[in-house]
Regions:
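Short, small-residue-biased leader/transition segments that mark boundaries at the very start
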Residues: 2-4
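Gram-negative outer-membrane beta-barrel transporters
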Residues: 64, 83-167
Length: 212
């Protein structure tokens, strides 16, 4: 993994990162030989902005992730898989954080992903399953610093996941969904346990039914 960044006096920090990964195979070919690992390469270029006079952090990034040597159906028509498949994903990531006051913090994020089978016996040009193009979230929390409830933090947020393809053949679509989350946290420093807290996180507070 490699990362290059440089912060300017105005609070702008452009950066570029490159990383590689691999995933060992667990299947074998027609001769009983274990397949070679699949490999991943990711490029990311972005900008982070932290103004000197305001508690705000804004980031934006473009990325491309390519996964090669994936298993795919044998073009010869056998029941065995062969190596050589490739999936590429390109996208945009945006995030903003702000402390509106000493007690109030908010976070918002958005991700756009364009994923495609670039090399595959059966699925070339299709979108991989369960990869939504759009995802977004908003979160806010409020912390009490005075009174009998001092140290208590209450938070809530909304997460949106866009529609996605349900299978590699793209024969059906899984619908989008939105869920609400919540948080209650108490800082135990108020009872002599500095550095510790107890928290309750509730995902999907409204018990929304959805397919993921």
């Amino acid at each position: 993994e490699m990362c290059i960044r440089d912060r300017f006096d105005n609070g702008v920090t452009p950066y570029f990162s490159y990383s590689e990964s691999f995933e060992p195979a667990s299947q074998t070919d027609a001769q009983g030989k274990l397949f070679s690992p699949s490999k991943g390469k990711q490029y990311e270029a972005g900008v982070k902005y932290v103004p000197n006079d305001r508690p705000i952090v804004v980031t934006g990034a473009l990325y491309q992730l390519t996964k090669t040597n994936n298993l795919m159906a044998d073009p010869a028509g056998s029941f065995f898989s062969v190596e050589g498949g490739e999936i590429r994903a390109r996208g945009v990531e945006l995030e903003a954080k702000a402390a509106l006051s000493a007690s109030v913090n908010v976070v918002g994020s958005y991700t756009y992903t364009d994923a495609e089978y670039t090399t595959d016996t059966n699925y070339k040009g299709n979108t991989p399953a369960q990869v939504p193009k759009h995802m977004a979230s908003v979160w806010g929390d409020y912390t009490l610093f005075d009174g009998p409830l001092s140290g208590l933090t209450l938070g809530t947020g909304v997460r949106y996941t866009g529609s996605s393809k349900g299978d590699p053949a793209n024969t059906f679509t899984v619908g989008s969904y939105t869920v609400v989350d919540a948080l209650v946290r108490y800082d135990l420093a108020r009872v002599g346990m500095a550095g510790s807290n107890v928290a309750l996180h509730v995902n999907n507070l409204l018990d929304r039914e959805y397919v993921a």
